[in-house]
Amino acid sequence: MNPPGSLGVLEEKEEEHLAPPILGPSIHSDNPQERIQARRLRIAARLEARRREALGEYLDGKKESEEDQSKSYKQKEESRLKLAKLLLCGTELVTNIQVAADIREIHRRVEEEEIKRQRLEKLENEVKTSQDKFDEITVKWEEGKQRRIPQELWEMLNAQQVHCAGLIEDKNKLISELQQELKMKDDQYVKDLKKQSDDICLLLERMEEQVKNVMKTFRQELQNIEKAFEVERQELLTSNKKKWERALQAHNAKELEYLMNRIKKVEDYEKQLNKQRIWDCEEYNTIKIKLEQDVQILEQQLQQMKATYQLNQEKLEYNFQVLKKRDEESTVIKSQQKRKINRLHDVLNNLRSKYNKQVKQFQEENQSLTSDYKRLVLQFKELQKAMRHFALIDDKRFREIWLMNEEEAKDLINRAFDVDRIISTHHLGLPWMAPDFWFLKNVGPISQQQQKSATQILEEVLMEAEKEGADEDSSESETYLDLPKQVSARTTRKILMLLCDESGFLIESKLLSLLLPLEKNECYLLRLDAVFSALGIENEDDLYKLVNFFLKYQTHHSPSSQEPLDLRAEKERSLVDGKSQEKEPPPSPKLIHPNDVLKILEAFVMSLRKPRDFWVPVKLLKAVRDDSKDSEYWEALTTVIPATTLNLWDALYTALEKYHLVLTQRAELLIENSSLERQNTELQQLLQQYLDTKINSELQVPPTQVFRVPTK
C-alpha cells in the first residue's frame, strides 16, 4: 500500500500533464492587442474542445479524477467532523470538573464572606457591651471611693467581683466560640484538600481515557482515509490502463494507415521520376542547340569589341593628357584651399573660446536664476500657507458673525411672534398659529446641494433598467435620465454592462472571487464601482461624460450611424426638443463591438489626461462660496411679519394710545375723587367733634335738631 504522499505526487504530475503551461499571449497583459489575441485563442480552444467532445475524444480521466477526488474529500471531511466532535466532547467532559470546582469555590467564598461579616458584627457588639460593662464598673469604683461605711464597701466589692467575673466569662465564651470556629475551618480545609485530590484523580482518569479514545479514533479514521485513497489508486490505475490500451490501439491503427499511405506515395513518386527523366532529356537537347547558336553570335560580337577597343585606346591616351593638365591645376587650387582652411581653423578656435565663455556665463546666470526661483517658490509656499490660514480664519469669523446676526434676528423674530400672539389672543380674541418658514430652521451659512456620486447614479440606472425590462413587451414609452441626448436608462445600462464585461482586467482577482456568490445586479454594481475607481470617475458629470464619449465615438467610427438604427432610436429622437430633431439619433449599444471597448476606454483616458499636460495655476484658496441666496435669506427674515399684520398693529397702536389716554384721565379723576373723599371725611370728623361738645347740650336749640348729621 502506497502512502498518501505518493498518491498526491501522482495526482500533481497528472494535472501538470493535462494542463500544459500557457506560453501564448495573456489576457492580463498591458497590451490591448495581446489581450484581444489571448481571447481569440481561448475561444478557439473552446471550439476545439467542443469538437473533440463531439467526436468522443474528450479525456474521461479528468472526470474520473474529479469523482475520486470528491470521494477522498468526502471521507476526509467526515473524519475531520467526527474528530472535531470527539475533541469537543472530551474537552467538555474534562473541563466539567474544573467548572464544578470553580462553582464550589465561589459558593465557599460567598459563605465565608457572610460568616466573616456576622463575626465582625458579633465582635463589634461584644466590644460595645464589654465597654459599657467596663464603664459601669469604673463608675462604681468612683462611687466606692466616696463611701465610708465598711458594710457598704463590702457589698460594693462583692458586686464588683460579680460584674468582673461576668465580663471575664463573656470574653472566655467568645474566645471558645472563635476557637471552635477555627477548628471547624481546619476540618473543612482537610475535607477540601481531600476533595481536590479526588477531583485531580478523576481529571487524570478522564484525560487518560480521552487520550486513548482520541488515539483510537485517529487510528481508525486514518485507516479509513488510507482505504479511500487505496480505492482511488486502484480505480486510477484501472482507468489509466484502459486509456493506455485505447491509446495503443489508436497508435497501431495510425501506424497501419501511415504505412499504406507511404506505399502509395512511393509508387506515385516512381511514376513522377520517370516522367521527369523524359522531360529532362528533351529539354537538354533543346538547350544544347540554343547554346551553340549563342556561341556563334558571341564570336561575332568579340570581333566587334576588338575594333571598339582599339578606338577607345586612342581616346584614352588623349584623355590622359587632358587629365594630367587638370591635375596640375588642381594641385595649385589645393594649396590655395589649405591656406584658406588654416585661416578658417583660426576663426573656429576664436569662436570656440567665445562659445566657452558664453556657456560659462550662461551657467552662472542659470545658477543665480535657479537660486532666485527656489527662493521665490519658498516665498510663494509661505504665502500660500498664510493665505490658507487667513482664509480659514475668515471663514470662521464669517460663520461666527453669521450665527451671531442670525441668532439676534431670530430672537427679534421670536419677540415679534410673541407680540403677534399676545395681540391676536388677548386683544383681538383670534386663534394664532406659529408660521413655518424654511429660513427659520436654517442654522449657519446657506450651503448648496451636493452633487450625486457615480455609484448613486449607477444604482438609479440599474433600478430604472429593471423596471423597463419588466415592462418591455407591454409598454411603448421609456424613462429617460438627464444624460446627453436624452439617452434611455436601458441604453445606458447596456453600455455599462458592456464596459463591465470587457474591462475585467481593471478589477483585482480577489475581488472577482468574492463577487461570485452575489446576485447579478450587486455583482455588476461592485464591478463597475471598481472600474470607475480605476478610471477616476467619481461624480455624476464624469459618468455622463463617459456615456456621451461612447455614443460620440460610435457615431464617428460607425459607417451605418448616419441612418436610423431601429424603432427605439426613433422613439429616443422623438422625445428631444425641436433643436435636437436636426441632430443624429444616438447609436444603439448593440452596434458597439466588444473589441472596440478597449479602444474607446483608451481614447477616453487620453482625453482626460490631455488637460493635465498644461500648467494649471495653484489653487490658493478654496472655492468661492455662492452668496446668491444670502440677500434673499436676510430679506426673508425681515418679512416674517406680513404687511397686513403691520397695518393691523398700527391700527391697534392708535386705538391703544386712545385707550391709554382715557385710562390716564380716569386715573387722574380717581386720584381727585380720593382726595375729595378724604377731605369729606375730615370735615365729617370736625363736625362730629363740634356736635359732641358739651356746650351744644346747654343751648336751647341744639344743632342736631336744625340739620341731620350725615353718617359715614
Swiss-Prot record:
Gene Ontology, cellular component aspect: axonemal dynein complex; axoneme; motile cilium
Keywords: Cell projection, Cilium, Coiled coil, Cytoplasm, Cytoskeleton, Flagellum
Main location: cytoplasm
Biased composition (Basic and acidic residues): 565-585
Presence of the UniProt keyword Coiled coil in the record: yes
Entry coiled-coil feature ranges: 100-388, 663-698
GO biological process, one term: cilium-dependent cell motility
Highest taxon, organism lineage: Eukaryota
Residues covered by region (Disordered): 1-34, 557-591
Cellular localization per UniProt: Cytoplasm, Cytoskeleton, Cilium axoneme; Cytoplasm, Cytoskeleton, Flagellum axoneme
Record family assignment: Belongs to the DRC1 family.
Subunit structure: Component of the nexin-dynein regulatory complex (N-DRC). Interacts with CCDC65/DRC2, DRC3, GAS8/DRC4 and TCTE1/DRC5.
UniProt function note: Component of the nexin-dynein regulatory complex (N-DRC) a key regulator of ciliary/flagellar motility which maintains the alignment and integrity of the distal axoneme and regulates microtubule sliding in motile axonemes. Plays a critical role in the assembly of N-DRC and also stabilizes the assembly of multiple inner dynein arms and radial spokes. Coassembles with CCDC65/DRC2 to form a central scaffold needed for assembly of the N-DRC and its attachment to the outer doublet microtubules.
Name of the protein this chain belongs to: Dynein regulatory complex protein 1
Organism classification: Eukaryota, Metazoa, Chordata, Craniata, Vertebrata
Gene name of the record: DRC1
